[in-house]
Each structure stands twice: as structure tokens, then as C-alpha cells.
């Protein structure tokens, strides 16, 4: 079985409440339940972590070292600001896919830059919660090939 860690950054605990026209109407718990069903079908153990605190996200990444085969991360607004989160991902050297529910390039200019996309195995944005499912399938495909 492959071990995949899904990390969600700041404000994603408010999915379904915060700007649902941008981020969708499903809450994070429902999304995780759906993803865990998909993970079972792919023979993946999926663990999830969400925090609004940058240092907790960093600790989660550090703790994934040698315990996780792949990371799927939605850094949320930290995408555009967090060099330290980028450095944490580089330090553990675990392949990851960056996911965003909205298309960050169709939004405000300050959201167009990502500190993660150039070091990510893949980048998915603009497909809502389906982006997470696609990332999970791509993580599985990557892990079975490599």
C-alpha cells in the first residue's frame, strides 16, 4: 500500500462557507470522506492534515519524512508567500502535487505566483474538488511507475 499525505493550508477548514462561488459548496470533511473512498479503491492509505498555522504545516511536512510516499498539498494563500514551506518540502524530498480549487491565474495578480509549482511533480488548479481526486489518481500512477 502507498502512503499519501494530503495537506490543506489556511482557511480551507471553511470550505463550503467561504466564497462558495469560488471554492465550492462542499465542506472539507465531505471532501476528505470522498477522497478516502477513492484512496481505498487505489490501495492507498490517505492521511489528511489541515492547519491555519504555517509552523504546524511545516512540522507536518517534517514528520512525513520516511513515513509518506507522496504528498498532495493545497498551500492556499501560503502559495504566494511561504518560502519556509517550500524549504520544508525540499528538505524532506518527497514528490508532491500542488492543488488549488480555483484557477489562480484567473484571479488577482498577486495570486499568480507560486513558490511551489517549479519544484512540484505536478500542478493542478481550477477544477474544484475534482482536482484533489485527479491528484490522488496521478500520485497513484506516479508511485506505481517509479
UniProtKB/Swiss-Prot annotation:
Does Secreted appear among the keywords? no
Annotated substrate binding sites: 74, 80, 87, 101-102, 111
Q: Hey, which pathway is this one from?
A: Metabolic intermediate biosynthesis; chorismate biosynthesis; chorismate from D-erythrose 4-phosphate and phosphoenolpyruvate: step 3/7
Q: Which residues form the active site?
A: 23 (proton acceptor), 100 (proton donor)
Query: Does the keyword section mention Ion transport?
Result: no
The EC designation for this entry is: 4.2.1.10
Q: What does this protein do?
A: Catalyzes a trans-dehydration via an enolate intermediate.
NCBIfam families, per database record: aroQ, PRK05395.1-1, PRK05395.1-2, PRK05395.1-3, PRK05395.1-4
This protein is called 3-dehydroquinate dehydratase
The organism is Blochmanniella floridana
High-level lineage: Bacteria, Pseudomonadati, Pseudomonadota, Gammaproteobacteria, Enterobacterales
Amino acid at each position: 500500500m502507498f502512503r499519501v499525505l494530503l495537506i490543506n493550508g489556511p482557511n480551507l477548514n471553511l470550505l463550503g462557507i467561504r466564497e462558495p462561488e469560488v471554492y465550492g459548496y462542499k465542506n472539507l470533511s465531505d471532501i476528505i470522506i470522498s477522497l478516502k473512498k477513492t484512496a481505498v479503491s487505489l490501495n492507498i492509505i490517505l492521511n489528511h492534515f489541515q492547519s491555519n498555522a504555517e509552523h504546524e504545516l511545516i512540522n507536518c511536512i517534517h514528520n512525513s519524512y520516511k513515513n509518506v510516499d507522496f504528498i498532495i498539498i493545497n498551500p492556499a494563500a501560503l502559495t504566494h508567500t511561504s518560502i519556509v514551506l517550500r524549504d520544508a518540502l525540499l528538505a524532506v524530498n518527497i514528490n508532491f502535487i500542488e492543488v488549488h480549487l480555483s484557477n489562480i491565474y484567473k484571479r488577482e495578480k498577486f495570486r499568480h505566483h507560486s513558490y511551489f509549482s517549479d519544484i512540484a511533480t505536478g500542478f493542478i488548479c481550477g477544477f474544484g474538488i475534482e482536482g484533489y481526486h485527479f491528484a490522488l489518481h496521478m500520485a497513484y500512477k506516479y508511485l506505481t511507475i517509479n
